[in-house]
């Protein structure tokens, strides 16, 4: 993490593992975290709002953003494009704010290239059977789509070792507590504290790096 920069957190999970619910609950607890809102070409799900959950754009508009190099990362998932606009993240971290990205493993790899100290947090379901039940309970996808997501889940879960932390979302309140603890621990790292409390460190004669 460079001077005057905030932490970048990446929450990664297969579809149906509870990633979005955990992120929403975390932001309710800690509104100081800046949520990076991704652009996507997929249709909104029930209850989703443009500009809050995603920037819903056409395929043509998305590809134009990509060609203009305005995306920090992008990927094609289940036939739809997803991408992260770079401007807001760069501005937030430069101002010392922590940024959180809901992202897939492909995107997480690309973010790591830009922010090597970005912290990956992988959310796992307690079992494939539980994942299947959650996908069905959402009532948003056909059986064919659910089958496709389950097939993809195995490949996505194989990338869990690329993350620094893993949370098994068996019981929601416990998973949320663990996610909150990861955020807190990252903020207490020496590199973070040295930036956030630079004046105190200087008064105490503590070097800014070690």
From Swiss-Prot:
Reaction catalysed by this enzyme:
GMP + ATP = GDP + ADP
Q: Where in the cell is it found?
A: Cytoplasm
What does the entry list as the binding residues for ATP? Answer: 13-20
Q: Does the keyword Lipoprotein apply?
A: no
- What positions does the domain Guanylate kinase-like occupy? 6-184
- Any one GO MF annotation of this record: guanylate kinase activity
Write out the GO cellular component annotations. cytosol
**Cross-referenced SUPFAM superfamilies:** P-loop containing nucleoside triphosphate hydrolases (SSF52540)
Q: Which UniProt keywords apply?
A: ATP-binding, Cytoplasm, Kinase, Nucleotide-binding, Transferase
Question: Source organism's superkingdom?
Answer: Bacteria
Q: Which Pfam families match?
A: Guanylate_kin
Q: What class of enzyme is it?
A: transferase
- What EC number(s) does its UniProt record assign? 2.7.4.8
The family database entries (SMART domains) matched by this protein are listed as:
GuKc
**NCBIfam families tied to this protein:** guanyl_kin
Q: What does this protein do?
A: Essential for recycling GMP and indirectly, cGMP.
Q: Which family does it belong to?
A: Belongs to the guanylate kinase family.
Q: Which PANTHER family match?
A: GUANYLATE KINASE, GUANYLATE KINASE-RELATED
- What is the protein name stated in its UniProt record? Guanylate kinase
State the species of origin. Answer: Bordetella avium (strain 197N)
Its lineage opens with: Bacteria, Pseudomonadati, Pseudomonadota, Betaproteobacteria, Burkholderiales
């Amino acid at each position: 993490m460079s001077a005057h920069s905030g932490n970048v957190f990446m929450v990664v999970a297969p579809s149906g593992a509870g990633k979005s619910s955990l992120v929403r609950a975390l932001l309710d607890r800690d509104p100081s975290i800046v949520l990076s809102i991704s652009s996507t070409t997929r249709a909104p799900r029930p209850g989703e709002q443009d500009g809050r959950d995603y920037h819903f754009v056409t395929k043509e508009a998305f590809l134009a953003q990509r060609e203009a190099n305005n995306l920090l990362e992008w990927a094609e998932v289940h036939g739809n494009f997803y991408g992260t606009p770079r401007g807001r993240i760069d501005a937030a971290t430069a101002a010392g704010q922590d940024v959180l990205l809901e992202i897939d493993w492909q995107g997480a790899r690309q973010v790591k290239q830009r922010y090597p100290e970005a912290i990956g947090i992988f959310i796992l379901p307690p079992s494939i059977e539980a994942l299947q039940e959650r996908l069905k309970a959402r009532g948003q996808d056909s059986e064919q789509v659910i089958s496709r997501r389950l097939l993809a889940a195995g490949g996505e879960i194989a990338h869990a070792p690329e993350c620094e932390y893993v949370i098994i979302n068996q019981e929601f309140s416990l998973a949320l507590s663990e996610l909150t603890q990861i955020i807190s621990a990252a903020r207490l790292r020496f590199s973070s504290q040295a930036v956030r409390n630079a004046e105190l460190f200087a008064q105490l004669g503590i070097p800014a790096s070690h």
